Design a protein with these regions (language model features):
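N-terminal Rossmann-like NAD(P) cofactor-binding module of classical short-chain dehydrogenase/reductase
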Residues: 70-74, 97-98
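Glycine-rich phosphate/diphosphate-binding loop of Rossmann-like nucleotide-binding domains
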Residues: 1-71
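Adenosine-phosphate binding glycine-rich loop
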Residues: 103-146
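Short glycine-/small-residue-rich Rossmann-like dinucleotide-binding loops
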Residues: 76-78, 101-102
Length: 146
């Protein structure tokens, strides 16, 4: 799981929860790998999880991370688009993309605030898009299963 905007409070919380469930978590930041790794180290120690820092400061580094990611989450601050359709078109393994940003412009282009598993036709694997206002609604499905 790659978390864009991962060094902020929402990204850190999502990362801790995912890592606690066994996910391979990368907290990404536009500030570079050193900063994101420092944040990951701090919370790894505090919550006994394993997260890694990742550099999302350039288009090249973003595209490189998307090559290996199954799950992508956008948690950057409101009003910043962190991933475009052009980015997502190159995410060959991505099956789920979630965006917690509900303020225009949305954080991940193509994912609307109310999307609940919307098939993103423009992605290689037709990834499921989950919008900010739908995220609270998936909790019961995660706990109970389909």
């Amino acid at each position: 799981m790659h978390i864009f905007g991962g060094t902020g409070p929402v990204g850190i919380c999502a990362g801790i929860l995912a890592a606690g469930c066994g996910a391979n978590v990368f907290l990404g930041s536009h500030l570079g790998k050193r900063i994101s790794q420092e944040v990951a180290n701090e919370y790894n120690k505090r919550f006994d999880v394993h997260m890694q820092g990742e550099d999302f400061g350039s288009k090249k580094s973003i595209l490189k991370s998307l090559e290996t990611s199954d799950v992508v989450m956008g948690t950057a601050k409101a009003g910043i688009q962190i991933l475009s359709k052009d980015h997502l078109k190159q995410a060959k393994r991505m099956i789920v993309v979630a965006d917690v940003n509900a303020v225009p412009p949305l954080g991940i282009e193509g994912v609307s605030v109310n999307d609940m598993g919307k098939e993103l036709e423009f992605t290689p694997k037709k990834a499921a898009g989950i919008g900010a206002l739908a995220i609270p609604g998936i909790g019961p499905f995660i706990v109970a299963g389909p």
